[in-house]
Swiss-Prot record:
Gene Ontology MF terms: ATP binding; glutamate-cysteine ligase activity; metal ion binding
EC number(s) reported in the record: 6.3.2.2
Key word ATP-binding present: yes
GO cellular component labels: cytosol
Top-tier EC class: ligase
Protein name, UniProt field: Glutamate--cysteine ligase
The organism of origin for this protein: Cronobacter sakazakii (strain ATCC BAA-894) (Enterobacter sakazakii)
Length: 518
């Protein structure tokens, strides 16, 4: 089932310098909660600056859903230290509030009023809140409070120069983009390994079912927690943040122009379902438009091709201008065993897996074939730790034991690890392989198995509160290591000033401005 990458690995052994200079960044979402674990109803703390313009600390869907962003970094330890510093600073700024340490929230009732993230009075600020209003009206607010970690990754130019004989990023943008699309197709085929190893949402609170019947064979605890005994990441299931209405958009990952055309089509295609919601009610906008996607970011995907946008530029126009600059991996649950929701093991594994995905052959895939890859993901998401679980290739029936496929994959990853360890010195990448491959012999070592044991004993709420309290104490007491309090003070003031400048520069009424965004 695993493609033969022996030639590519031999090439890598001869060109180790091609992996010198991998760059990466992290984004982590977390809900602000009260000491009792309930969603905080306070506004975004002014001491954390303006969510619209802050470099490191912003908000996602809800006013209480924090998002932390590290700058692009070539050094794993430094990147994780910066992320921890952001957490340390925030923990001190939140007073009694805590950061929820799980992907799935718990103490949110059906129909509870969840305040949308607020970004001030500028047109762009109001637009961002309106987009979130559209998400709430389309999919329900509860689904939007699920948290995850995003890992951004780019291969060095030296890799593409050696692999595709490109001269520079500009003239080589088609070849580099084709290489990243190969990586993405392999991710769709084999990325289920991420929830298998690191999924940490095997259970949900009953409020997540919103009273709707489900075909999933949930077991229920006395405290009202629903769980699947072999599940890994219900966050990635249809109960979590996926969008079924997008499954037939026909977007493919074979080439830049085809991908962008599919994305632009979805933004322009009207939706009968969303038209029924209406655009306005009592003079207030309900959504940006009534199309299948309000904006490109609404496309649900476990991985995205990306390029840093210029002012006023859409993500797809940025891709057309300069090609793919990096990819964003979106399938990581919050790691409940880390105070910052992610750890070094995961980052090193993702480095290895991304390189493998870039090396392995990946035939082009139709949109139907892309949908078929979802079958393996769903198996792993819902019953990944089930003894004897099998996986399929493409649209064929499942016939390959997950345990064997996982071990075959790690045999390749270990060779990539030897190359990366050779560049950096030490054995860290190989040690990560040794630790993680054991999860295929013993699924009880996976994050989902470990956290489920605690959840069955203490409930989701009890587990979340216990970890939130522990991490709050730990982070508040730790000194900053990479950043300084002065850095945070300066960025807080600068972000508020930037927001005021944006608001002062706006002269156009919002309705007129919004009409031009279509």
């Amino acid at each position: 089932m695993i493609p033969d990458v022996s030639q590519a690995l031999a090439w890598l052994t001869e060109h180790p310098e091609a992996l010198k200079g991998i760059r990466r960044g992290l984004e982590r979402e977390t809900l602000r909660v009260t000491p009792e674990g309930e969603l905080a109803t306070t506004g975004h703390p002014e001491s954390l600056g303006a969510a619209l313009t802050h470099k490191w600390i912003t908000t996602d869907f809800a006013e209480a859903l924090l998002e932390f962003i590290t700058p692009v970094d070539g050094d794993i330890d430094h990147m994780l230290t910066v992320m921890r510093d952001i957490h340390r600073h925030t923990a001190r700024a939140l007073g009694d509030e805590r950061m929820w340490p799980l992907s799935m929230p718990c103490y949110i009732k059906e129909g509870q009023d969840i305040e949308l993230a607020q970004y001030g009075t500028s047109n762009i600020g109001r637009f961002k809140t309106l987009y979130r209003s559209g998400l709430k009206n389309r999919y329900g607010a509860l689904m939007q409070t699920i948290s995850g970690v995003h890992y951004n990754f780019s291969l060095p130019l030296a890799f593409w120069q050696a692999k595709c004989q490109v001269d520079d990023a500009e003239s080589g943008k088609e070849a580099i983009s084709a290489g990243y699309f190969r990586l993405i197709r392999n991710y769709y085929r084999f990325g289920w390994v991420i929830p298998y190893l690191f999924g940490a949402s095997p259970a949900i609170c009953s409020s997540f079912l919103q009273g709707k019947p489900t075909k999933l064979p949930f077991e229920k605890t006395d405290c009202g927690m629903y769980y699947l005994p072999y599940a890994t990441s219900l966050r990635l299931s249809d109960l979590g943040y996926t969008n079924k209405s997008q499954s037939n958009l026909g977007i493919t990952f074979n080439d830049l122009h085809g991908y962008v055309a599919g994305l632009k089509r979805a933004i322009k295609t009207p939706s009968e379902e969303y038209a029924k919601l209406g655009l306005k009610k009592d003079g207030e906008y309900l959504q940006i438009n009534t199309n299948i996607l309000q904006i490109e970011n609404e496309l649900y995907a476990p991985i995205r091709p990306k390029r840093v946008t210029r002012d006023g530029e859409s993500p797809s126009d940025a891709l057309l201008r300069g090609g793919i600059e990096y990819i964003e991996v979106r399938s990581l649950d919050i790691n409940p065993f880390s105070p910052i929701g992610v750890d070094e093991n995961q980052v090193r594994f993702l480095d290895l897996f991304m390189v493998w995905c870039a090396l392995a052959d990946a035939p082009e895939m139709s949109s139907d074939e892309l949908l078929c890859t979802r079958t393996n993901w769903n198996r792993v998401i819902l019953e990944g730790r089930k003894p004897g679980l099998t996986l399929g290739i493409g649209c064929e029936t499942a016939q390959f034991p997950l345990e064997k496929v996982g071990k075959d994959l790690f045999r390749d990853l270990r060779r990539v690890a030897q190359t990366l360890d050779g560049i950096h010195g030490g054995q860290e990448y190989q040690q990560v392989c040794d630790r993680l491959v054991a999860c295929f012999d013993d699924p009880e070592l996976t994050y989902s198995a470990q956290i489920l044991r605690s959840m069955i004993e203490n409930g989701i709420g009890g587990t979340g509160r216990m970890l939130a309290d522990r991490y709050r104490t730990m982070l508040r007491e730790e000194p900053l290591q990479a950043l300084h309090e002065e850095d945070f003070r300066q960025e807080q003031a600068a972000s508020l000033a930037r927001q005021r400048e944006i608001e002062a520069a706006d002269t156009e009424p919002f309705d007129e401005w919004l009409a031009k965004q279509a």
